[in-house]
Amino acid sequence: ANMKYFDKYGLELPTNYDELKEVCKTFRDNGEYPLVIGAKDSWINIDTWMNIAADINTEKLYSAIEGETPFTDEDLVQSFQIWQNCFTDGVFQDGALGVGMYTDSTDMYQKEGSVPMILNGSWSLGAYMDSDEQSQEVYNGEGANHKIFLMDWNNDGKIAPVEEAVDVSLAINNQSKVKDAAWTFVDWMIHEGADTLVNGQLQYMPARNDMELNVEGLNENGTENLEYCVEQGKNNVGGYREMAYAELKETISNELTELALGDVTPEEAADTIEAASQAQER
């Protein structure tokens, strides 16, 4: 969230869906954007739905993905309902399905500073270190203040957990004739290299618990947000971000779009996804 908009209209960061809906209404009433999502991109739709579902019942979400709980379960149907409500309640911006995240949506938030809120992952913290002049002004200019926050989607008093994924993995070829040299490089990447990518460039979240965070050139506001992300990544993890089942994932993506368009009900979407789940080889 870009806090200059919240300060301008005397608003607090929303902590649950009902508060989010009211904040978005206030922004809309004053000619501002509500919560921005690049819903043309399936990955952000799936990320958001999984966050909603994990907030309602983490165990059932991952059990359903593995084919052990039906997607027609009432908790999962509720997750589809909340996703659809984000469009019908005006939480997401008008025309969200027609714009992507990168860079249609991210430029408005990161470079123009023209939207109050955006849905994105912890990697967006890299904007604090972006050499682009517009980003520098938005994130490091006088009075700049941004906050990363999680949502209580079902208004039960508990914020959603985060989902995590491996972004880059390193491996040594079993047939290599220079395994020792390869390991030297891998070991460097895990330690000195990782320190450069995190503390020198803020390109990734730290994967090592023993890494001391001291990002060069990161302002106080950025440091606060980084510490928040690291804390959530350590102590509030729902599960994995990337599901292993391509056909099921595609069906979920399609149904999330249909829900956003209002062409299906949450119950109908659940039926379609459950059929795909039953047909999915695991």
PLM feature segments, named:
Residues 56-78, 133-141, 152-161, 212-220, ...:
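Short, solvent-exposed loop/beta-turn-alpha elements that line the ligand-binding surface or hinge
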Residues 24-26, 66-97, 147, 151:
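Glycine-centered hinge/linker elements that transmit conformational signals in sensory
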Residues 9, 133-203:
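Extracytoplasmic/periplasmic substrate-recognition and gating elements
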Residues 8-13, 68, 85-101, 113-114, ...:
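A local structural motif
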Residues 146-150, 199-254, 258:
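Long, aromatic- and glycine/proline-rich binding clefts that accommodate carbohydrate-like moieties
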Residues 17-22, 96-111:
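Short helix-initiation/N-cap motifs at beta->coil->alpha
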Residues 31-33, 111-120:
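Alpha-to-beta junction loops
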Residues 1-15, 21, 32, 38-65, ...:
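Periplasmic solute-binding protein
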